[in-house]
Every structure is written in C-alpha cells, then in structure tokens.
Amino acid sequence: RPYACELTVAAGPCLRFSAFYYSKGANQCYPFNYSGCGGNANRFSTNQKCRRTCVV
C-alpha cells in the first residue's frame, strides 16, 4: 500500500468539502469533511479511488 494509506485522517483548518480517508485498522474507506488546506495524503476525492488505492 502507498504511504498515504498509513496516515491518520487530517481535516485541515479551512473551508470544508467531502472527501474520503482510509482507516488502516478497519481496512475501509470513510467519508470526512476536508477543509481544503493542510491535512495529509490520506485524502481521496471518491470512495472508489480510496478503495482502489488502499483496501487490501
């Protein structure tokens, strides 16, 4: 799995929009409100992209 899949979710401090993050413990992707700035690479625009990248 890519490094992004190892990171915890980080929403960031600005305006929010929907995105998806990977939970390593659950081996699943979940929606969250991303702020549009800050955060980390564990952020995907769709559930499908998240699952395709990270879910084993």
Curated annotation (Swiss-Prot):
Gene3D superfamilies: Pancreatic trypsin inhibitor Kunitz domain. Keywords: Disulfide bond, G-protein coupled receptor impairing toxin, Secreted, Toxin. It is found in: Secreted. GO terms for cellular component: extracellular space. Expressed by the venom gland. Residues 5-56 form the BPTI/Kunitz inhibitor domain. Signal peptide: none annotated. Disulfide bonds join 5-54, 14-37, 29-50. Its main location: secreted. The keyword Ribonucleoprotein does not apply. Transmembrane segments: none annotated. One of its GO terms (molecular function) is serine-type endopeptidase inhibitor activity. It comes from the Eukaryota. PROSITE patterns: BPTI_KUNITZ_1, BPTI_KUNITZ_2. Interacts with vasopressin V2 receptor (V2R/AVPR2), probably in a selective manner. Inhibits vasopressin binding human V2R in the nanomolar range (Ki=45.1 nM), and also potently inhibits vasopressin-induced cAMP production (IC(50)=111 nM). In vivo, intraperitoneal injection of this protein into rats increases diuresis, without any loss of electrolytes. Exploits its two major loops and engages more positions in its interaction with V2R. The pharmacophore defined by numerous amino acids positioned in loop 1 (9 to 17) and loop 2 (33, 38 and 43) may be at the origin of the absolute selectivity of this protein for V2R. Belongs to the venom Kunitz-type family. PANTHER family: BPTI_KUNITZ INHIBITOR DOMAIN-CONTAINING PROTEIN, KUNITZ-TYPE PROTEASE INHIBITOR-RELATED. This is Mambaquaretin-9. It comes from Dendroaspis viridis (Western green mamba). The lineage of its organism: Eukaryota, Metazoa, Chordata, Craniata, Vertebrata.
